[in-house]
Amino acid sequence: MKINNSLLNFVNGMLVTLPSSKTLTLSWNFGSMLGMVLVFQIVTGTFLAFYYTPDSLMAFSTVQYIMYEVNFGWIFRIFHFNGASLFFIFLYLHIFKGLFFMSYRLKKVWMSGLTIYLLVMMEAFMGYVLVWAQMSFWAAVVITSLLSVIPIWGPTIVTWIWSGFGVTGATLKFFFVLHFLLPWAILFIVLGHLIFLHSTGSTSSLYCHGDYDKVCFSPEYIGKDAYNIVVWLVFIVLSLIYPFNLGDAEMFIEADPMMSPVHIVPEWYFLFAYAILRAIPNKVLGVIALLMSIVTFYFFALVNNYTSCLTKLNKFLVFLFIISSVILSWLGQCMVEDPFTVLSPLFSVIYFGLAYLLLGIFMTSKLLFK
């Protein structure tokens, strides 16, 4: 069916008539699920913003007001809180799937995806601070102070973000505005990510590169994406039965600038990076290692190699990389004491070693098998 409207024609080409391989599995649902969760987070977050007050004296109490006084406010708050965890679960599955199938060969898709990941981490951190609880307040103090390692301008940048000489109500307003606006920038980059992907196709080893052996995206894969409904049902049930199991008990205590928690721990989806940061006693080197834990994957897109040799070795190393990431996440929430202070540097070295080994295999496979 021909559509004359240019906007509808664009949407039709992306969601209906897009030529798609017959062999894509359910692991290709992660992207569509991420899009659904992103929209879900924007909707629930907008509702919460109606009642939230970005003031250091009222922020914590307005969160309690939403929970206890606003009609169905507790549902929106619980779903928004757990929706962030659901988003990161599928985001990490999406990234690991990309490593598994060497998706970094699609340079624009890979680079835009990593940029989305960095922005989402910033977005989640700022949302975490908005509760203005004891743990989130001190997490804001620790993380923002890391910017002071930037040569020359570092202390000035920290003072500018804090709007003073410490994390205050002005910092809270700054984070609230960015937390409200950043999702729209993420949506824009997601659109670019989608366009780049659909203009080149997938990197699955089963992928068919001729349009003669493909099917339209709808209804074949629209129906397959309907399996996401099962995930949503599980998410709703778990959120209602265990609403705060993924949080910290300190998040129920109002922020006290005069007393820090015994053990500062970020949300679970930042723990692997936090473990790498703590593994290095030097502040500057720790921040560099923290950044490189993510920035390293940008280097994959700089290699001009479109072959897919050594795929079995690549998949084996990806599984080892996933295991090391999970162990680092566990170490990130452990106390700073033996044996964890020994294990964290060890698994940080393994993490980077596997990442650069994957990069090295990707670089050399073309030379070995050309």
UniProtKB/Swiss-Prot annotation:
Q: Any note on cofactor binding?
A: Binds 2 heme b groups non-covalently.
Substituting residue 297 to V results in: In strain: JU725
UniProt effect for mutating residue 234 to F? In strain: ED3092 and ED3101
Which residues of this UniProt protein bind a ubiquinone?
A: 198
Q: By its UniProt entry, which PROSITE patterns does this protein fall under?
A: CYTB_CTER, CYTB_NTER
Q: Name one GO molecular function term.
A: metal ion binding
Q: Which sites bind heme b b566?
A: 94, 193
Q: Which GO terms describe its biological process?
A: mitochondrial electron transport, ubiquinol to cytochrome c; proton transmembrane transport
Pfam families linked? Cytochrom_B_C, Cytochrome_B
Annotated membrane-spanning segments are: 30-50, 74-96, 109-129, 175-195, 221-240, 284-304, 316-336, 342-362
Summarize where heme b b562 binds, as residue positions. Answer: 80, 179
Query: Mutating residue 342 to I: effect?
Result: In strain: ED3033, ED3034, ED3035, ED3037, ED3092, ED3101 and VT847
Concerning InterPro entries, the annotation shows: Cyt_b/b6_C, Cyt_b/b6_C_sf, Cyt_b/b6_N, Cytb/b6-like_sf, Cytochrome_b_C_euk/bac, Cytochrome_b_N_euk/bac, Di-haem_cyt_TM
Say if the entry is tagged with keyword Mitochondrion.
yes
Effect caused by changing residue 317 to W? In strain: JU725
What is the protein's membrane topology class? Answer: Multi-pass membrane protein
- Tell where it localizes: Mitochondrion inner membrane
Q: Which UniProt keywords apply?
A: Electron transport, Heme, Iron, Membrane, Metal-binding, Mitochondrion, Mitochondrion inner membrane, Respiratory chain, Transmembrane, Transmembrane helix, Transport, Ubiquinone
Requisite cofactors: heme b
Assembly state and interactors? The main subunits of complex b-c1 are: cytochrome b, cytochrome c1 and the Rieske protein.
Other remarks in the entry: Heme 1 (or BL or b562) is low-potential and absorbs at about 562 nm, and heme 2 (or BH or b566) is high-potential and absorbs at about 566 nm.
Q: What does this protein do?
A: Component of the ubiquinol-cytochrome c reductase complex (complex III or cytochrome b-c1 complex) that is part of the mitochondrial respiratory chain. The b-c1 complex mediates electron transfer from ubiquinol to cytochrome c. Contributes to the generation of a proton gradient across the mitochondrial membrane that is then used for ATP synthesis.
For this chain, the family text in UniProt reads: Belongs to the cytochrome b family.
Name it.
Answer: Cytochrome b
| Organism listed in the record | Caenorhabditis briggsae
- Source species taxonomy: Eukaryota, Metazoa, Ecdysozoa, Nematoda, Chromadorea
